[in-house]
């Protein structure tokens, strides 16, 4: 049983449980979201985790958290409530060194290869390895699946069972979802993109041949980092064939970054709405 489609609030978790026939399930997987310190602690009171996952840390929601240290503190609330062990992404593991629960640095993935039609990688547990492929795009997808694999292994699934499940994972709507239409590849990454997600999406875009066009309103909810991160985003777009910026305020630092990195002014435009773009 899982919480559906980013239903990561107290009401969302409660609805998932109340609407299910619990006797049909052995495991409940709950997504926990936060915009303020204390939000995850509240969710853990409702649903205390046996095994928890921290998939990463970035500046998303700094507008409401205020500081990066508050983001780390909020994520750490799940570790304070974890009964068995926590699986933590390698690139942020050290941020949680002071928490007492058993912590596992996600290290079961290796030899990641990225293609237009998916991602191949190796999963290894207790000296046994399996080569797997997912239709999900980008190296970050391999690392996200590895986190899930660590959790699955922790609750008793075998490596073969995990490996067989990887190809069955489907696209998540609006999260780097590949849509083929009339000979055109569309990467729909429209859901609440953060800094890491935007960088990953651009790397995936580079895997494809042909003209590369990006439509973006910029990155939101970054607080004091909003100007800097949107400027950096603009620099990363400078080598593309065309860029369409949507909106008014956030797109200005994106355009400045684009120009700073040598982007062609004839290949970028600003439109007021997504429909106009």
Regions found by a protein language model. Give the residues of each.
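AMP-binding/adenylate-forming catalytic core of the ANL superfamily
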Residues: 71, 193-255
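Short, intrinsically disordered, charge-balanced linker/junction segments flanking boundaries
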Residues: 270-277
């Amino acid at each position: 049983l899982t919480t559906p489609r980013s239903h990561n609030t107290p009401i969302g978790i409660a609805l998932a449980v109340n609407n299910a026939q619990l006797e049909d399930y052995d495991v409940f997987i709950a997504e926990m979201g936060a915009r303020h310190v204390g939000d995850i602690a509240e969710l853990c009171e409702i649903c205390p985790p046996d095994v928890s996952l921290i998939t990463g840390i970035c500046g998303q929601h700094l507008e409401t958290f205020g500081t990066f240290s508050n983001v780390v503190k909020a994520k750490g609330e799940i570790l304070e409530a974890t009964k068995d062990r926590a699986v933590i992404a390698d690139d942020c593991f050290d941020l949680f060194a002071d928490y007492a629960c058993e912590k596992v640095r996600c290290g079961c993935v290796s030899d990641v290869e990225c293609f237009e039609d998916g991602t191949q990688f190796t999963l290894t547990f207790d000296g046994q390895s399996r080569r797997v492929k997912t239709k999900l795009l980008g190296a970050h997808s391999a690392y996200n699946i590895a986190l899930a694999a660590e959790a699955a292994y922790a609750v008793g699934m075998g490596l073969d069972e995990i490996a067989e499940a990887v190809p069955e994972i489907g696209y998540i709507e609006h999260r780097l979802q590949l849509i083929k239409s009339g000979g055109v590849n569309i990467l729909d990454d429209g859901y609440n993109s953060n800094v890491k997600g935007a960088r990953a999406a651009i790397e995936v875009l580079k895997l494809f041949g042909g003209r590369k066009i990006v439509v973006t309103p910029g990155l939101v909810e970054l607080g004091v980092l909003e100007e800097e991160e949107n400027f950096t985003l603009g620099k990363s777009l400078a080598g593309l064939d065309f860029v369409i910026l949507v909106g008014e305020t956030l797109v200005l630092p994106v355009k400045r970054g684009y120009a700073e990195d040598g982007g062609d002014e004839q290949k970028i435009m600003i439109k007021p709405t997504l429909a106009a773009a």
